[in-house]
Structure formats: structure tokens, C-alpha cells
Design a protein with these regions (language model features):
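Short, charged/polar, Gly/Pro-enriched secondary-structure boundary elements
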Residues: 50-53, 115-116
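A short beta-turn/loop motif at secondary-structure boundaries
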Residues: 35-37, 58-61, 98-102
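Vicinal oxygen chelate
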Residues: 4-13, 43-46, 59-122
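Core segments of cupin and vicinal oxygen chelate
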Residues: 2, 9-51
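Structural preference for long, well-ordered alpha-helical segments within the folded cores
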Residues: 20-21, 80, 114
Length: 122
């Protein structure tokens, strides 16, 4: 049912410095950047088919770490996690594409045992 880790999100204190660091030292390439709700800046970097999501909050807080798992059967995955008693943090919803060649997708967010966010993408 689950295929792979789609992306990992890291909160950083200086978005430009972190983008430069991951591009220069690890070969990542930034492909999209935007300002999200609440003044959070987000930059998406790729290395192969792996995405690193760097976020910076204007208030300096470092909350909301998460990772995302891609699934072949979104509705089945959601049903199984709910059946297993996994707490849902955000209901299933559609998201827009982050780049022109990408299609939007369905996503849902669950919580792990320590409150960590586990995003499921289908």
C-alpha cells in the first residue's frame, strides 16, 4: 500500500542560507518557493525524486516537523490508519501542484505517538 517517503520537512532559521547549503554541498536544486499561510516561507528542493521541504516562520518558531509517505491507494491507506486508531490531525483534502509539470494530489495528516505529523499523499 505505501510506496516511499515522498518528502521530509525541516524548519530552518535562514531560508536562503539553507537553500544555498543544500544546493552547494549535496547537489539539491530548488524548484519552487512560496509564502504560505501565517507568514511561513517554504522552499522545495529536489535530489533525484526526493524532495526536501525547507520552511521558515517569520516568528522564528521551529514547530511542525513532518515527513510524507506516498501511497498507491489513498482511500485504502486512510481507512486502514483510521481503523487502527491513528489520530487524524488534518482531514483529507486536495492540494495544488508545486510546479508546472506536477499534478496536484490528495493529502491527509495523521499524528504519530509523540505528536509528530505523518502526511499521507496519494
Amino acid at each position: 500500500m505505501f510506496k516511499r517517503i515522498d518528502h521530509v520537512a525541516l524548519h530552518v532559521s535562514d531560508l536562503d542560507r539553507s537553500v544555498d547549503f543544500y544546493e552547494e554541498h549535496f547537489g539539491f536544486k530548488k524548484y519552487f518557493q512560496h509564502m504560505a499561510a501565517g507568514g511561513m516561507q517554504i522552499a522545495y528542493l529536489k535530489l533525484g525524486d526526493t524532495v526536501l521541504e525547507l520552511t521558515h516562520r517569520s516568528d522564528g518558531s521551529m514547530k511542525g516537523f513532518h515527513f510524507c509517505i506516498e501511497t498507491e491507494s489513498f482511500e485504502e491507506a486512510v481507512a486502514e490508519l483510521k481503523k487502527g486508531g491513528v489520530e487524524m490531525a488534518r482531514a483529507p483534502h486536495d492540494t495544488a501542484a508545486r510546479e508546472p509539470r506536477e499534478k496536484g494530489w490528495r493529502r491527509v495528516v495523521f499524528r504519530g505517538p509523540d505528536g509528530e505529523q505523518i502526511e499521507i499523499r496519494g
